[in-house]
Amino acid sequence: MKLVLIRHGQSEWNKLNLFTGWHDVDLSEEGVVEAMTAGKRIKEAGLEFDVAFTSVLTRAIKTLNYVLEESDQMWVPVNKSWRLNERHYGALQGLNKQETAEKYGADQVQKWRRSYDTLPPLLEENDERQAKNDRRYQLLDTHAIPSGENLKVTLERVIPYWMDTIAPEIKEGRRVVIAAHGNSLRALVKFLEGISDDEIMELEIPTGVPLVYELNDDLKPVNKYYLDK
């Protein structure tokens, strides 16, 4: 069984080196090219899908659309869930990463970005950036909407969705592609591979490059590789 993961192509805020999180930004021109290239590589590799999953953020949705279009699979059903969203960067969202490092220190910012269990500064309740003000989240329990997340909290929302919704599809023999985000995919990879809390800090997933897992019957990886050529 194969599972394909794709981090969205470069976004406009990736290009500007800004913390993005749940803020909804579009793909950059380079990001569009990355997504289209990913779809072409998937087609060349002969990978076919029966069902697709993505977040409710534009950059991941568009990446998936380009991938399916370029691989001639636009008909594949797509499921969108906030549980596959990027990690919520709290009050850091919209800030420049370099300027934030200069203000708070590179070590502190590195902990906010990469530590498994260090939370970023949280959004204030009345902050206009709160996701509860966004129509796509208005049907959610307000207690489920974060004001900021670390990777641990991100994993705690991603893995139940994997277990309850995605994994059963794979066990039924359906071929799955997931287009999501750097940290929601890091959370899933941590779970699949059993990566330690310390080791996950070093894991980087490149934008727009398909990551293919070969899984056994227990959905444990027996092989993985990037379609980067």
Curated annotation (Swiss-Prot):
UniProt entry tagged with the keyword Isomerase: yes
Picking any one GO molecular function of the record gives: phosphoglycerate mutase activity
Q: What is its EC number?
A: 5.4.2.11
The protein's UniProt keywords, in alphabetical order, are:
Gluconeogenesis, Glycolysis, Isomerase
Pathway the protein takes part in = Carbohydrate degradation; glycolysis; pyruvate from D-glyceraldehyde 3-phosphate: step 3/5
* Highest taxon of source: Bacteria
Q: Which reaction does it catalyse?
A: (2R)-2-phosphoglycerate = (2R)-3-phosphoglycerate
Task: List each coiled-coil range.
Answer: none
Q: Where is this site: Transition state stabilizer?
A: 181
Q: Which Pfam families match?
A: His_Phos_1
Function recorded in the entry: Catalyzes the interconversion of 2-phosphoglycerate and 3-phosphoglycerate.
Q: What is this protein called?
A: 2,3-bisphosphoglycerate-dependent phosphoglycerate mutase
What species is this protein from? Listeria welshimeri serovar 6b (strain ATCC 35897 / DSM 20650 / CCUG 15529 / CIP 8149 / NCTC 11857 / SLCC 5334 / V8)
Gene of origin? gpmA
